[in-house]
Amino acid sequence: MQVDPTKGIGLANTSLQFSNGRLHALCEYDLPYVVRLSPEDGDISTVGRIENNVSTKSTTAHPKTDPVTGETFSFSYGPIQPYVTYSRYDCDGKKSGPDVPIFSFKEPSFVHDFAITEHYAVFPDIQIVMKPAEIVRGRRMIGPDLEKVPRLGLLPRYATSDSEMRWFDVPGFNMVHVVNAWEEEGGEVVVIVAPNVSPIENAIDRFDLLHVSVEMARIELKSGSVSRTLLSAENLDFGVIHRGYSGRKSRYAYLGVGDPMPKIRGVVKVDFELAGRGECVVARREFGVGCFGGEPFFVPASSKKSGGEEDDGYVVSYLHDEGKGESSFVVMDARSPELEILAEVVLPRRVPYGFHGLFVTEAELLSQQ
């Protein structure tokens, strides 16, 4: 069997996005694939690879949708200049404005995730870099550069070039995933909450030796200074928030507890308002010996527009008990100090450990094109 790489080689196994009546399966070295989830029996079918309305050869597995405007923001990255290209789409999913090549990336970096705020797109430039020449030497193309100083870059959301981009050195801050970002003080301060990966030299080959602590970084736009506050010293990643607060100031996040990563032995709730006062974990659920979960996901009890509290909802996840060989789906009370399990459904077959998840509502299922 011959494979045409121009028709896609991605596994579409990293993340999921529901947008404009379509469920997208994503990975960062290919374009999105549209899949359809049957509302009747849950059967999944592949519709096809998205090739129109996209001018790059790949897209991030972590696009961001602004819950206020409905716009979606994305990017692609690779080992050839421009190393990162930014793009945006209107609320109907149509390409909006030109792609923006970000030439101020000095070398090809591992840019897995990014953030949006009301006025900016926030990009990390971390100590994991790509060195294509290493392939010729029989070595791995991606690896750490311990001499590099990590940076955060702010690009105006509606920029048409990277001439307005500002970079801020943040030594020791290697942001692979983002929890949320927002603006304060009339837009003069940009706040980013994200796990910080260390030691970075173990990020590719030795996940079991990684420790991922959650930090809050504050960028003062007038002075250019950056301050950091540790929110939790625990080994936490795969953080989620109420999606209605994406890009806007939020208070709570729910993160997986590594045992070590990528296995998740429990979920914690972090309160950002406790920043600067020590450990910010305010709720916890441990899954038990030999029981591990996937990325948690927050499901609001009602929409943000209805005026409910930010944490009024549920945290859901798949679990697998390795001792019993049993998989289940659990629903936890997001407001409970113990993240109390309200419901657990034992599943008829194994659900493998994965990367990122998505909760799709009944209304979204029925709206699929």
Curated annotation (Swiss-Prot):
Subcellular location: Plastid, Chromoplast
Organism annotation: Crocus sativus
Annotated keywords: Chromoplast, Dioxygenase, Iron, Metal-binding, Oxidoreductase, Plastid, Stress response, Transit peptide
One Gene Ontology cellular component: chromoplast
Function: Cleaves zeaxanthin symmetrically at the 7-8 and 7'-8' double bonds to produce crocetin dialdehyde and hydroxy-beta-cyclocitral, two water-soluble precursors sequestred in vacuoles and involved in the synthesis of saffron pigment and aroma.
Enzyme class: oxidoreductase
Coiled-coil region(s): none
Gene Ontology terms describing biological process: carotene catabolic process
Lineage: Eukaryota, Viridiplantae, Streptophyta, Embryophyta, Tracheophyta
Family in the record: Belongs to the carotenoid oxygenase family.
UniProt keyword annotation of Oxidoreductase present: yes
Induction: By dehydration.
InterPro entries found in the cross-reference section: Carotenoid_Oase
Known tissue expression: In the style branches.
Reaction(s) catalysed (UniProt annotation): all-trans-zeaxanthin + 2 O2 = crocetin dialdehyde + 2 3beta-hydroxy-beta-cyclocitral
Superkingdom of this protein's organism: Eukaryota
EC number: 1.13.11.84
Keyword Metal-binding assigned: yes
Name by which UniProt lists this protein: Zeaxanthin 7,8(7',8')-cleavage dioxygenase, chromoplastic
Molecular function GO terms recorded: carotenoid dioxygenase activity; metal ion binding
Cofactor note: Binds 1 Fe(2+) ion per subunit.
